[in-house]
């Protein structure tokens, strides 16, 4: 973009869609955020995502939740999005609905490496279906974060070249969504912890704005 859009339509209220929606709105653009789930940041803690949704609504970002983009077209009036029966017209569109690992064209079949549309299949030591071949980063279909890919790469090199294989623990991975306020996460979500540990889980809320 070379100029600030008058009305930006964003499809997908994950981390990138949420960050960009708030950033462009604060720069002065009208923003409509379309999300198929019932809340923004649907993979984050429900309490945190509820707070972000309330902040967005208070700032004037239009949230269209439980909605799916069914049709897109462009004409002299702008970019049209038909979302759950409503036509929304803007002059810029951002699609933020996730990424698929780009593994086609690598001839993985010839090497006997198993993969799916979600990425190359690896075990907790980052070995593929061919134990002497390792994979790391976004191509494994795991967390798509730069810091996580770097950590995986270092573990893959260590396991491939040195004795004593290390295992990766996904529950340790932290991430942050740079909205305002920020949403930071590390370890299990409450629902995941309760599923694993039952009534042994305790929850404490600390208001950080007081």
Locations of regions flagged by a protein language model:
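FAD-site-proximal beta/loop scaffold in flavoenzymes
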Residues: 1-5, 88, 92-162
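Glycine-rich Rossmann-fold phosphate-binding loop(s) that bind the pyrophosphate
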Residues: 11-14, 138
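N-terminal Rossmann-fold NAD(P) dinucleotide-binding loop
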Residues: 17-18
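Gly/Ala-rich phosphate-binding loop of Rossmann-like dinucleotide-binding domains
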Residues: 21-26
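A Rossmann-like FAD-binding core segment of flavoenzymes
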Residues: 27-124, 208
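Mid-to-C-terminal Rossmann-like scaffold of FAD/NAD(P)H-dependent oxidoreductases
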Residues: 45, 58, 69-70, 99-102, ...
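General small-molecule cofactor/ligand-binding pocket signal
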Residues: 62-64, 134, 202-204
